[in-house]
Amino acid sequence: MSTSPDVVSLFPHATILATHPPGQAPTYETLHPAITQLNANAASIPSNSGDGTLGHIVLTIGQASYQTISNGNVAYPPPVAPAPLIIPQGTSAAMIAELRRNHDDATAAFNKYNAVDAALKKQILDATDVTYITSLKDRTTGFARVTTRQLIEHLYNNYGRITVETLTDNEARMKQPWDVTTPIELLFEQIDDGQAYATAGGEPYTDRRWWVVCFFHVTPTGGNLGALLSPLVCVKPKPYW
């Protein structure tokens, strides 16, 4: 199926970052920024399914994660191709119109879902050397039956592993001194990125450990600035998905 130009034109990222440097295998550090852009693209295409606010992000994060972050923890079942429309004899004109409208809506939702997946898949294929995904490629159909989510899972499972050493480096990055002449949002991002990395590595921060990192930043500032920053920085984030 060809990629709908209307879908691609709505993406905030016309292309995504490369999932790895030239000649080097992907890592979590190189995969995460690219997949984050892919998530944003998926979420930008409206959908009435699920909770109706997250677009088609289910295509990149999967069903379980979608239900976790959706309003009301609702699921997003993938649309199925509707069967040919059959109109029983004796059906009223009004009911025929309703049946046709419902069938058209179901067909449009199915086609849109697959068009978005095709567009996202093309982006990740363009951003990744085939060497690292060749095990998913069929000799006859290529990647035609491979979904965007399957590509993402393959890359993370095979190349995005987080080690004890990289977790140690991550905490050091979280504790890098903040330049107080820059916006405080940069400090928030620094700590949030570290928390997300630790969670992805299977070592989410306990409350105690979180506060240790938090006060590492606010206590050296002292004075009124420290008092000002403390309630801002030391707010434990929501769980990451």
Regions found by a protein language model. Give the residues of each.
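Long, low-complexity intrinsically disordered regions in eukaryotic proteins
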Residues: A64-Y66
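Fungal eukaryote-biased detector of long internal structured cores
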Residues: I152-Y159, N170-P177, V233-W241
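"Short basic amphipathic alpha-helical interaction patches in structured regions
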Residues: L136-F143, N170-E171
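Terminal peptide-recognition signature
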Residues: I124
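Short connector loops/turns at beta-strand edges and beta->alpha or beta->beta junctions
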Residues: D129-I133
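Amphipathic alpha-helical oligomerization segments
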Residues: H20-G50, I69-A81, I87-D105, Y113-V116, ...
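Plant-biased recognition of short, low-complexity, intrinsically disordered N-terminal tails
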Residues: M1-P22
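Short coil/turn segments at secondary-structure boundaries
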Residues: K137-R139, A227-S230
